[in-house]
């Protein structure tokens, strides 16, 4: 998590909310897709939910493949896909006590 957003707001924390069955289905589908498309042996994705603060790790991605280039390409794809398409709802809390739901992930 970054300390500022695209508007340069000073972010104190963020809450990530999700609907468990929908998000689990989405992640499972993404894993199956990248395993097939990037010829991976297997992939693991874990995404934080709940309250996070700047510098917290939000995502862990691990891939197994015959060649590391396949994994590097797959991880890049996964991170971009999660950022733009994952069914996660984000609410930012700012240092000036404002709060706002994130409408678009950039």
Regions found by a protein language model. Give the residues of each.
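N-terminal, polar/charged subdomain of small-to-medium soluble alpha/beta proteins
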Residues: 1-57, 64-106
């Amino acid at each position: 998590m970054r300390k500022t957003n695209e508007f340069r707001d000073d972010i104190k924390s963020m809450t990530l909310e999700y609907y468990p069955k929908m998000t689990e289905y989405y992640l499972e589908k993404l894993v199956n897709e990248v395993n097939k498309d990037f010829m991976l042996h297997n992939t693991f994705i874990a995404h934080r939910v709940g309250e996070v603060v700047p510098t917290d790790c939000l995502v862990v991605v691990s891939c197994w493949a015959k060649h590391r280039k396949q994994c590097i390409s797959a991880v890049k794809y996964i991170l971009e896909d999660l950022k733009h398409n994952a069914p996660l709802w984000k609410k930012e809390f700012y240092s000036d006590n404002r709060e706002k739901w994130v409408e678009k992930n950039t």
